[in-house]
Design a protein with these regions (language model features):
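Mixed-charge interfacial surface used for oligomerization/domain docking
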Residues: 1-154
């Protein structure tokens, strides 16, 4: 998405300094949200104790997570079951986003395109972004999201 923003700036004929300022503002205004099928990655990296992960998994509790401006991960909400968690995620995104009509929504998924499409549908009922892109996770995102994980950036 950052590369797309740089290309957009170039198409507008911006100077190098203007591109830098515009892209830095764009990055500061981006928000990341995610929902994991498995809590194993959170347990392994110490963000969730083994006992909490076991109980949450047994009860099918899915935490809706987000990134803070400082780059740390925080829990925004939770729900029992993936369908309810997707609704909760869409609600959280809609509650925190201003001027969505000026932004591109990117939804990345790890082997769950139907889940990404469902999140898109839920979000389009709440927001009207400039565009929506759905893509597969890649690299380190795939490792953390694991199968069934969904990441939204707007």
């Amino acid at each position: 998405m950052i590369a797309m923003k740089i290309a957009e700036c170039e198409d507008k004929g911006m100077t190098f300094g203007e591109v830098i300022d515009t892209v830095e503002t764009y990055i500061e205004d981006q928000h990341t949200y995610f929902l994991l099928e498995s809590l194993e990655a959170l347990r392994k990296n110490g963000r969730l104790t083994g006992l909490k992960a076991m109980v949450a998994t047994a009860l099918s509790i899915k935490p809706v997570m987000g990134a803070t401006p400082e780059g740390t991960i925080c829990q925004l909400g939770q729900a029992r079951g993936m369908k309810k968690a997707l609704v909760k995620m869409a609600d959280e995104i809609a509650a925190h986003e201003e001027h969505a009509e000026d932004k591109i929504l990117a939804i990345s998924h790890c082997n769950c395109p139907a889940r990404a499409e469902e999140l898109k549908k839920l979000l389009l009922a709440r927001l009207q972004p400039k565009d929506v892109i759905i893509l597969d996770t890649a690299g380190i995102s795939s490792l953390y999201a694991s199968d069934g994980g969904v990441i939204a950036v707007i």
